[in-house]
UniProtKB/Swiss-Prot annotation:
It is found in: Cytoplasm. Its cofactor is Mg(2+); Mn(2+). SMART domains: malic, Malic_M. GO terms for biological process: malate metabolic process. This is NADP-dependent malic enzyme 3. It comes from Arabidopsis thaliana. The modification N-acetylglycine is found at G2. Optimum pH is 7.7. Its EC number is 1.1.1.40. NADP(+) binds at residues 189, 303, 332-348, 444. Mostly expressed in flowers, and, to a lower extent, in stems. In leaves and stems, restricted to the trichomes and trichome basal cells. Also present in the stipules flanking the base of the inflorescence bract leaves and in the meristematic zone of developing lateral roots. In flowers, present in pollen and the abscission zone of developing siliques. The keyword Membrane does not apply. PROSITE patterns: MALIC_ENZYMES. InterPro entries: Aminoacid_DH-like_N_sf (IPR046346), Malic_enzyme_CS (IPR015884), Malic_N_dom (IPR012301), Malic_N_dom_sf (IPR037062), Malic_NAD-bd (IPR012302), Malic_OxRdtase (IPR001891), NAD(P)-bd_dom_sf (IPR036291).
């Protein structure tokens, strides 16, 4: 071969077939190798040093040693200094903190991910509390709105109506074969921002970066997908920079057939055990897809099930503060879409299992308000099917404040996607009814939150137990510091995904979501409670995810839905051993 190239041999494949690092075959020996063992960084059958530096999986930037530079023909292509990964991390964080605009930070991080994958994930893991609002909510919402303008390089797989009849061929274009997790969106309901069409790709990309950083699933096992069936957003259709199909959304039979082809192709290409997470689909499609495919595929809807699980975890944890069981509470929701009804159903299921009462009876303690007012029996015939179980006997009530005074809830939960709907009068009414009102303003992004942390603490005179969907800064009130909790799905889905992969699950069941909720609630300490928190700090997220994965895995084995046999003796250790490490490897 030429002097500037390296010949690859078939002997490079190492590691056992079961694999670690997120449950896929360890093709490059990167995770089965200890940190001081050498791995071979070949990208293609013949790779030059120049190519090596431009592959984000293997690029180490200025961390290539002199020996590695000589061996892989990099000498002279980099400045002479050799920097450790820790120094590189400090440098990048210093540069990120110079940006005052969150979107600029987001773009800088995405650029890093496309240049140096391991440094990106090390940065995210070590600085999760600071960077989580950048790579995900709330900043990712703005990134999706402006995705056409900031688009640089393709991330993920785009499957549009133009590919109808050949989706399997498109899936085979993706270079990685051992896919374990797919996050897919059709962009119709991105956060609280509505129909962003093809520009919703930022959501699957962001979610999967968190599957890796927080749950330890290997980046090469993750596949972000956007299904482009058009958009009804006129601004995007008239925007010359829009990157998707410029046509109205397909619906009805055309939509159903396209999704059917997609789901069949996924199963055919990646097998029975690939986890498909539906993300930010509109209500009418989200419930239908989950119901249709839950018995034939390993599917999960984060908006319905992930949100439900994380909220239930907060409610379980809050029992220690309030001294009440879930069955003692009365719940009132503002918002009766995917999130609201999903949370309500999981709460009802948990109470049913605790009390032995039928779920139809436990639902009666849970009330929902939609855009037309309180959901009551006389509205049942006109309600969408997923709202009908929540239509209880009561006279019609139009306004939220009137509903609070009529129902007298102990817990107020906002999933409306409409900001400032928990008004001063509503929050003060909750404080009048309860010594410690539990208020969850869950809508994302921050601008769509039903109320702010400061408003909740001020209007209840510091008595509220508060959590939100997007982050809020600590609040000083009456000489005391209150730290608002964040009911972020990121607590649940990375550990849940790892648990499903680790056990070789073939289906997702509600009992697994309950197990995840209980595992998360168990991680809240007395110190957290003293600071007003009902969720643990994100700084411990990998430990939290390992515990959730172990609980989900245990439940999967218990239900007979696990295929990785025999069951490991210590599931927590198994989860920790499966986690991807972003530390640089030494190359031969």
């Amino acid at each position: 071969m030429g002097t500037n190239q390296t010949q690859i041999s078939d002997e490079y494949v190492t590691g056992n077939s079961s694999g670690v690092g997120g449950g896929i075959s360890d093709v490059y020996g990167e995770d089965s190798a200890t940190l001081d063992q050498l791995v071979t960084p070949w990208v293609t059958s013949v790779a030059s040093g120049y190519t090596l530096m431009r592959d984000p999986r293997y690029n180490k930037g200025l961390a290539f040693t002199d020996k590695e530079r000589d061996a892989h023909y990099i000498t002279g292509l980099l400045p002479p200094v050799v920097l450790s990964q820790d120094v590189q991390e400090r440098k990048v964080m210093h540069n990120l903190r110079q940006y005052t605009v969150p979107l600029q930070r987001y773009m800088a991080l995405m650029d890093l991910q496309e240049r140096n994958e391991r440094l990106f994930y090390k940065l995210l893991i070590d600085n999760v509390e600071e960077l989580l609002p950048v790579v995900y909510t709330p900043t990712v919402g703005e990134a999706c709105q402006k995705y056409g303008s900031i688009y640089r390089r393709p991330q993920g797989l785009y499957i549009s109506l133009k590919e109808k009849g050949k989706i399997l061929e498109v899936l085979k274009n993706w270079p990685q074969r051992g896919i374990q997790v797919i996050v897919v969106t059709d962009g119709e309901r991105i956060l609280g921002l509505g129909d962003l069409g093809c520009q919703g790709m930022g959501i699957p990309v962001g979610k999967l970066s968190l599957y890796t950083a927080l749950g330890g699933i290997r980046p090469s096992a993750c596949l972000p997908i956007t299904i482009d069936v058009g958009t009804n957003n006129e601004k995007l259709l008239n925007n010359e920079f829009y990157i998707g199909l410029k046509q109205k959304r397909a619906n009805g039979e055309e939509y159903a057939e396209f999704l059917q082809e997609f789901m069949c192709a996924v199963k055919q290409n990646y097998g029975e055990k690939v986890l498909v997470q539906f993300e930010d689909f509109a209500n009418h499609h989200a419930f239908e897809l989950l119901s249709k495919y839950c018995s034939s595929h390993l599917v999960f809807n984060d908006d319905i099930q992930g949100t439900a699980s994380v909220v239930l975890a907060g409610l379980i944890a809050a029992q220690k503060v309030l001294g009440k069981s879930l069955a003692d509470h009365t719940f009132l929701f503002l918002g009766a879409g995917e999130a609201g009804t999903g949370i309500a159903e999981l709460i009802a299921l948990k109470i049913s299992k605790e009390t032995g009462k039928p779920i139809d009876e436990t639902r009666k303690k849970i009330w929902l308000v939609d855009s037309k007012g309180l959901i009551v029996s006389e509205r049942k015939e006109s309600l969408q099917h997923f709202k009908q179980p929540w239509a209880h006997d009561h006279k019609p009530v139009k306004e939220l404040l009137a509903a609070v005074n009529a129902i007298k809830p102990t817990v107020l939960i906002g999933t409306s996607g409409v900001g400032k709907t928990f008004t001063k009068e509503v929050v003060e009414a909750m404080a009048t009814l309860n010594e410690k009102p539990l208020i969850l303003a869950l809508s994302n992004p921050t601008s769509q939150a039903e109320c702010t942390a400061e408003e909740a603490y001020t209007w209840t005179k510091g008595r509220a137990i508060f959590a939100s969907g997007s982050p809020f800064d600590p609040v000083q009130y009456d000489g005391k510091k209150f730290t608002p909790g964040q009911a972020n799905n990121c607590y649940i889905f990375p550990g849940l995904g790892l648990g499903l992969i680790m056990s070789g699950a073939i289906r997702v069941r509600d009992d697994m979501l309950l197990a995840a909720s209980e595992a998360l609630a168990s991680q809240v300490t007395e110190e957290n409670f003293a600071n007003g928190l009902i969720y643990p700090p994100f700084a411990n997220i990998r430990k939290i995810s390992a515990n959730i994965a172990a609980s989900v895995g245990a439940k999967t084995y218990e239900l007979g839905l696990a295929s990785n046999l025999p069951r490991p003796k210590d599931l927590v250790k198994m989860a920790e051993s499966c986690m991807y490490s972003p530390v640089y490897r030494n190359f031969r």
